[in-house]
């Protein structure tokens, strides 16, 4: 996936 914003996640966000 690509680095996505917190509010809008088009792809599964990585574990931050």
UniProtKB/Swiss-Prot annotation:
* Induction, as annotated: By bacterial infection.
Q: In its keyword annotation, does this UniProt entry include Thylakoid?
A: no
Q: Which residues are noted as glycosylation sites?
A: 11
Q: State the GO CC annotations.
A: extracellular region
List the InterPro entries hit by this protein, alphabetically.
Answer: Formaecin
Q: Which UniProt keywords apply?
A: Antibiotic, Antimicrobial, Glycoprotein, Immunity, Innate immunity, Secreted
What's an example GO BP annotation here? Answer: defense response to bacterium
What does this protein's UniProt record list under function?
Antibacterial peptide. Has activity against E.coli but none against other Gram-negative bacteria and Gram-positive bacteria.
Q: What is this protein called?
A: Formaecin-1
Organism (species): Myrmecia gulosa (Red bulldog ant)
């Amino acid at each position: 996936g690509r680095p996505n914003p917190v509010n809008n996640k088009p792809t599964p966000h990585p574990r931050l």
